[in-house]
Design a protein with these regions (language model features):
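Surface-exposed, secretory/extracytoplasmic low-complexity segments enriched in Ser/Thr/Asn/Gly/Pro
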Residues: 1-120, 124-145, 149, 164-165
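Glycine-rich, acidic and aromatic/proline-enriched surface loops and short helix-turn segments
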Residues: 150-164
């Protein structure tokens, strides 16, 4: 089932807001919990509850370890943010329509803080956050920067304001 229905980690072709298509991957998407689903199926079969009046009862949702927004079309749904790394622009879509867009600067490549391409879900949103770089042997950090908002989507990578960056 997982090889047929999982979308997490798979390559997908998307049409960019600025035009053209690109292929993206990432951890976002549907992912069946194979161990739990196997156990659930074994229980259904052994208990006989998968049969009713001689008919197979196949309408059930698998056990997922991760769910996406939609099973139709783009599994991230119609409300999402697109960050165009090449064009250095961010777009906010609501119900498939652009409701906000702005220029942006992505990770500082010269300092090895690149922004990865891919599809991710936001982990949480936070205001007034201090972002810290790697911890140095003396216990201090490579950098400490205050941001007004922070929305991580891939570990220590996320969307935030960056008053110290202009390009």
């Amino acid at each position: 089932l997982a090889s047929r229905y999982d979308t997490a980690g798979t390559a997908r072709t998307v049409t960019k807001a600025a035009g053209g298509q690109t292929e993206i991957t990432g951890p976002y998407g549907w992912k069946i919990d194979q161990a739990a689903e196997t156990a659930a199926l074994m229980e259904l079969v052994s208990s006989g509850s998968c049969w009713s009046e001689g008919q197979a009862q196949a309408d059930r949702e698998p056990v997922y370890s991760q769910k996406a927004a939609s099973r139709e079309g783009m599994d991230w749904g119609t409300t999402y943010v697109e960050v165009d790394l090449g064009g250095q622009h961010v777009y906010m879509f609501k119900e498939a329509q652009i409701v906000w867009d702005a220029p942006c600067v992505t990770g500082n490549v010269s300092k090895d803080y690149t922004t990865p391409s891919g599809i991710y879900s936001l982990t949480y949103k936070e205001k007034d956050r201090i972002l810290r770089g790697k911890k140095k042997p003396d216990g201090t950090y490579e950098y400490e920067s205050h941001v007004d908002y922070w929305m991580p989507f891939n570990g220590g990578i996320g969307l935030h304001d960056a008053s110290w960056r202009s390009k």
